[in-house]
């Protein structure tokens, strides 16, 4: 339930604040707390009244909690001034760019793509590259994004999000049969009913 998620986030933020008080000049702890605050700021907009997941670009930004955003942005700006970047700082900087955009169309995807490339250098993983593909699709189109994630298939075949993202790119290209297959695979791997329902919406929107 949403209340349980909020309680867990509140507790995680409380612990991160304690950690920062113990190590007040550690930029990665600042980055961790900033990331938590920025993510928690969107919690009210992440699900609709039926409990279905709402994509970041479709969320009502008026529901985002501005005090948490302002605190998170101030923390990440302070952390980055140390010039000792790390994975948490980079992830928080990405979240910060989303938070700074008044509308989804205002998102600085070029900067986000660059930050994901930095994250790939600091903490390389197929999931980081998959996340970067979303930014690349906005910049260079879904074909380029598909090319980026194609080598990830063997390692991410059991990952719900991989097939959902891949299906979205295929759908944008009009490759509906392949998109349908990817979405069905994502539904089979979904961890929650909300995840499955979200993918089913994409599946239902495909033309026969």
Task: Describe the predicted segments one by one.
Residues 36, 62, 99-103, 135-136, ...:
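Residue-level signature for tetratricopeptide repeat
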Residues 1-117:
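Amphipathic helix-loop-helix modules that constitute alpha-helical solenoid scaffolds
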Residues 28, 87, 91, 127-128, ...:
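Start-of-helix register in tetratricopeptide repeats
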Residues 21-22, 81-82, 117-122, 151-157, ...:
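Solenoid-like repeat scaffolds
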């Amino acid at each position: 339930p949403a209340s349980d998620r909020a309680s867990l986030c509140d507790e995680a933020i409380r612990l991160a604040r304690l950690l920062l008080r113990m190590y007040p000049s550690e930029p990665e702890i600042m980055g961790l707390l900033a990331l938590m605050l920025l993510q928690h700021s969107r919690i009210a907009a992440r699900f609709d009244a039926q409990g279905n997941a709402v994509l970041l670009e479709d969320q009502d930004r008026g529901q985002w909690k501005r005090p948490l955003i302002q605190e998170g942005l101030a923390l990440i700006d302070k952390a980055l001034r140390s010039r000792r970047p790390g994975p948490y700082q980079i992830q928080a900087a990405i979240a910060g760019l989303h938070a700074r955009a008044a509308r989804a169309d205002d998102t600085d995807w070029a900067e986000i793509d660059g930050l994901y490339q930095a994250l790939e250098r600091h903490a390389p993983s197929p999931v980081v590259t998959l996340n970067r593909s979303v930014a690349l699709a906005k910049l260079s189109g879904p074909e380029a994004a598909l090319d980026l994630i194609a080598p990830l298939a063997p390692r991410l075949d059991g990952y719900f999000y991989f097939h959902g993202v891949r299906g979205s790119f295929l759908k944008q290209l009009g490759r509906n049969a392949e998109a349908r297959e990817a979405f069905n695979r994502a539904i089979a791997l979904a961890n929650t009913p909300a995840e499955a329902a979200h993918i089913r919406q994409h599946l239902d929107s495909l033309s026969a």
